[in-house]
Amino acid sequence: NTIGQAEHPVLAALRERMLSHRLGNMAIAREQAALLSWLAQLIRVEKYLEIGVFTGYSSTAVALALPEHGKVTACDINVTFTDIARETWRAAGVEHKISLHLQPALLTLDDLIAQGEAESYDLALIDADKPPTPQYFERCLKLVRKGGIIAIDNVLLNGRVLHEGDEHSPPSLKILQTFNRSLPEDKRIVPITLPVGDGLTLLLKK
């Protein structure tokens, strides 16, 4: 028996489909997506920004929680995976809410800022390649409104961020460790890290 939110049938089907995929472990945890959906309803999200779509689980979960006029801006570079995401959006009846940008996310974020979209988003999720995380964060901080939330996935890197790395550690480890340590001192946000999935940090913009 499940305690908490019931999983939408389309999301359940996608999760089952990805269980047998060799990269299926890249998908956001069901509990994390449920939390994002809950947050979207709590703070009445109308515009959602997602960096790293993969096969569309989190974008679908949040889009389902948005009002009919809600908008999702989705950033990715992988056509193969986002084709699955498009199928999922169609099946869930949310494709009309979602705008997919297939180019490096930093380009899309800079375009949005240049187009006057600063402080217009209510919620953002960073769930992409780890080295640019600090750059993604700074752009999202410009794009999210005061009182909005920036969520960052995989902040624990399977627990590796809690330990000193060695010469075999990926560059992303040091970058994420430094970034994580900087958040409590950042006066622009109120951070909290939850041990859900591979670690989810929520940043409330002041």
Residue positions per predicted region:
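A short alpha-helical cap/connector motif
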Residues: 1-125, 130-151, 155-206
